Structure formats: C-alpha cells, structure tokens
C-alpha cells in the first residue's frame, strides 16, 4: 500500500493577500487607492485577495463601507481573480446577512471567522457555520480559526461535522501551530483546503498538507512568497527554505505589534499612502517604524 497522501484542491489558488483597507487624510475609505493596490497585488503574484478581514480592519468598518470596498476591488481586478469578502460576525443573523450580500455583490467566496467575545460552545459554532452555509449555498466559504483574537477555537471534529455542507471548501488556520493542519486533515480528509494564516508558518504547514497561504507579507514581497510556495511544491525544499529564512526578519517585523499596524506603516514607507489604522489601533511608534524601515531596506535588491 502506497503511503502517499491525497492532496487537497486549491479553490482560490496558492497565494491570497489579506488586503489592508486604505484610508484618506480624513479617515474615509479610499476606494480608488484600494482598487490600485488590489491590481498591484495581483501583478505581484497574488492569486486572489481577501477584503474586510483582520488585516482589512473589519471591526471598524461599517457594513456599507465593506460593501463598497468589495465592489471597488472586484471591479479593479476583473472576473479572473478570486476575491473573498470577510463576512464574519459574532451574531449569526449578521453573518448570514453579510454573506448573502457578498454573494449578490459578486464575491468569489467568503472568509467567515469564528464568533468572537461570546465564546460559543462547539455545538454553537457548528450551528452558526451551518446557518451561513445554507443561507448562501452557491458561495464557497473559508472558515477562519484565530483563537488568539476571538477567544474560542473551532475543533477539527466540529469542522468534520460540517463537511456535508458542499460550499464549506477551505479553512484558514491561524492558531499558530502546524498540528492544527494535521488534525484537520485527519478529521476532514483531503476535501478541505487548508491555508496557512501565518506567514512564518507557511513552509512547515505546506509540509503537513496546507495548500497555500492567506498572507500579510505579500503586500510587500508577493513574488518572493509565491516563489517560496512554488519551490516547495515543485520539489525544491532547499530553495523554499532559502526564501523562508530571508523573509523571517520581515515576518517578525510585520507582527511586532498588532496587525495591521506594521503592514500599513510598511506600505507607507514603500510609497503606498494607505493611511493609519482606525482607532482604537494607532500608528506604528517611531522606534518600530525606524526598525521596520531598516528591515525593508535590507530586503531590497542591491
């Protein structure tokens, strides 16, 4: 009997960028800049984009702003690029409504985070995601587990019970461990496409069955992120490891404080005036900004 494992599909490609939300000088969403940035990210190697997720500051965006942002990005990149909308909420009715609206607005999928703050039990999580899946059966869903932010973690057995929902096709693993990927594959099989939610864990997660990454660093090093993933998948682990080790300083700098504070500063330093995060997040402090600038300079070709 061959020990070869079945590989998962890639419903949204290998490299997705979790987009920042640009704000203008008055703090309003800059839709024109969002469109230009989206196009740039695709040109730099992203297969698809996620709008209104954690990096996109969804907690401080109104539903109207999120809808406008999805429309602007969708128009900017055209029909050939998957665009996922963050539609999660800790209220099931709100998440259902947002997911239906995203489907109607032309999203190619929805990123749906586990409910935060109210800490539902596993049975509540199952009911929550089942209601969302049934409300928009034509829209592929990516479940999103990030317990460090939400206060609850979705167990692999719970995800496995949801595999009868045909539109639950993928999972963003952001618990900070490779064990989550293994446990999900053992519980759900190869049907579920697992994406790393941590830039620094992409390479080890690929080795245990993840199919790609929802990346923050790809705002700045999209081609290198893509090269790392492709090198590993094409049987060049040493090349992939070389990319990984070169990028570790950037990965650390981008998560030296709360995301997306550093990546917005990095984009500003790179000529993209995306503005500061909305309160209660703050701009990156001067010392960290100087260190980030040095990290970016070290990555530039000489």
UniProtKB/Swiss-Prot annotation:
Entry's localization field: Cytoplasm
Which Gene3D superfamilies has this protein been placed in?
Aldolase class I
Name the CDD domains on file: DHDPS
Any one Pfam family match given in the protein's UniProt record, by short name: DHDPS
What start and end residues bound the annotated signal peptide? none
Domain of life of the organism in this record?
Bacteria
Q: List the disulfide bonds.
A: none
Part of a proton relay during catalysis, annotated site positions: 54, 117
Family label: Belongs to the DapA family.
Functional summary from the UniProt entry = Catalyzes the condensation of (S)-aspartate-beta-semialdehyde [(S)-ASA] and pyruvate to 4-hydroxy-tetrahydrodipicolinate (HTPA).
**Alphabetical list of NCBIfam families matching this protein:** dapA
The name this protein goes by in its record = 4-hydroxy-tetrahydrodipicolinate synthase
């Amino acid at each position: 009997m061959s020990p070869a494992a079945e590989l998962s599909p890639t419903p949204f490609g290998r490299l997705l960028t979790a987009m920042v939300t640009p704000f203008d000088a008055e703090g309003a969403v800059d839709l024109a800049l969002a469109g230009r940035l989206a196009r740039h990210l695709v040109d730099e190697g992203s297969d698809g984009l996620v709008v209104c997720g954690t990096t996109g500051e969804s907690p401080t965006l109104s539903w109207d702003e999120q809808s406008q942002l999805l429309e602007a990005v969708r128009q900017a990149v055209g029909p050939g690029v998957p665009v996922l909308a963050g539609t999660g909420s800790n209220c099931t009715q709100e998440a259902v409504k947002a997911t239906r609206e995203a489907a109607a607005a032309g999203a190619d999928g929805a990123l749906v985070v586990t409910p935060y703050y109210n800490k539902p039990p596993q049975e509540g999580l199952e009911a929550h995601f089942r209601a969302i899946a049934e409300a928009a059966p034509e829209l592929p869903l990516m479940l999103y587990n990030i317990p460090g932010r939400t206060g609850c973690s979705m167990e692999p057995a719970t995800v496995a019970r949801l595999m009868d929902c045909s539109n639950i096709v993928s999972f963003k693993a952001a618990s900070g461990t490779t064990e989550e990927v293994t446990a999900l594959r053992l519980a759900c099989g190869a049907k579920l496409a697992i994406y790393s939610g941590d830039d620094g864990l992409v390479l080890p997660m690929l080795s245990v069955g993840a199919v790609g990454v929802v990346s923050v660093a790809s705002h700045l090093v999209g081609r290198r992120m893509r090269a790392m993933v492709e090198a590993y998948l094409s049987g060049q682990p040493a090349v992939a490891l070389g990319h990984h080790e070169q990028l570790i300083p950037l990965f650390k700098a981008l998560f030296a404080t709360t995301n997306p504070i550093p990546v917005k500063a990095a984009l500003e330093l790179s000529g993209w005036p995306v503005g500061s995060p909305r309160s209660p997040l703050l701009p990156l402090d001067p010392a960290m900004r100087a260190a980030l600038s040095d990290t970016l300079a070290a990555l530039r070709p000489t």
